[in-house]
Amino acid sequence: MGFEWGFKPSSKITQSTVSSQGTGNVMIPTAGVKQKRRYANEEQEEEELPRNKNVMKYGGVSKRRPQPGSLIRGQPLPLQRGMELMNKNQLQQLLVDLMTKHPEIQQSVHTRVIGLDFSIQKCLDMLKQKSEAVYQSIPYNRSYESNKLDDYAFVRMKPQILEFLNCLVDFILDNIPPRLENLHASLKFLDICTELVIKLPRFELASNNYYYDKCIEQLSHVWCTLIEHVARDRIILLADNSSVWKSHMTRLQVYNEHSNGLLERPLQLFKSLDMGSPSAASSSTLSLQESIIYHHDTMTANENNNNSGSAATDSPFN
């Protein structure tokens, strides 16, 4: 008989069991029963082995690992808290991206923006920041005090110049009638804006100063428009002190000298104002209206000439 793996044959187990029952009901363990009990103990040890994996290596104390459901998981900030932490540039870029992806909300956003009342001082602060950006973009190899910056400086400074001039034009149009009914505030704001443009560093090549000259021409038109509003308002002409208008006229004369006569037309309109008697004010109003008609005709002719010639396509003043 060869080696038999496993339990004994069932016939022999049955015979041994019967023989044991015949001897006083005393259970006599056989070899097969012992072997079966040994395998049962091994299976029990294998079942208990995974339970003891959490036993500490050195301490010998069993600790249960926390269940995943009891851990606190991190989560992103709510929308309101996230927007509170965003800076100005991030909020602006987010709004621009949303309007680009969803053009239907542009009108709603524009309606809300134009309904806001921005102070003149806030506009001036923004213009001064953009003006400083122009000066900071000047290359170190040339000084801006000589007003002879080269072509390399123009290429470096062009984006900052256009950004400043675009912002300046937008703010001016938002602070003149009918957007702003206070003529004194409009004139004062226009005066400061003109000074900012006049003081900008200029370039040695005349064609590189195109944006400056075009902007000053547009400022000249705005000056003439405000002077026209002043001439039509007799209360301002008679009630206000003439020194206020003389101060504006004196400063405008200085700007005209620095701009090579580009502000000559509004300067002549200012000189035609008479702050004397009502009859003098009325006559000055008539002469001013005639000058304004001539000014509009001249402006139209200049625009036609500019359109016929070659102009920069990225100019904000075309």
UniProtKB/Swiss-Prot annotation:
The molecule here is called Tethering factor for nuclear proteasome STS1
One GO MF term on file is: proteasome binding
Q: Give the keywords, sorted.
A: Cytoplasm, Nucleus, Protein transport, Transport
Composition bias (Polar residues) maps to 11-24
Which organism's genome codes for this protein?
Answer: Saccharomyces cerevisiae (strain AWRI796)
- UniProt record similarity statement: Belongs to the cut8/STS1 family.
Gene this chain is encoded by: STS1
Give compartment(s). Answer: Cytoplasm; Nucleus
Q: Does the keyword Signal apply?
A: no
Subunit relationships? Binds the proteasome. Interacts with karyopherin SRP1 and Proteasome subunit RPN11.
Q: What does this protein do?
A: Involved in ubiquitin-mediated protein degradation. Regulatory factor in the ubiquitin/proteasome pathway that controls the turnover of proteasome substrates. Targets proteasomes to the nucleus and facilitates the degradation of nuclear proteins.
Segments carrying the region annotation (Disordered) are: 1-75
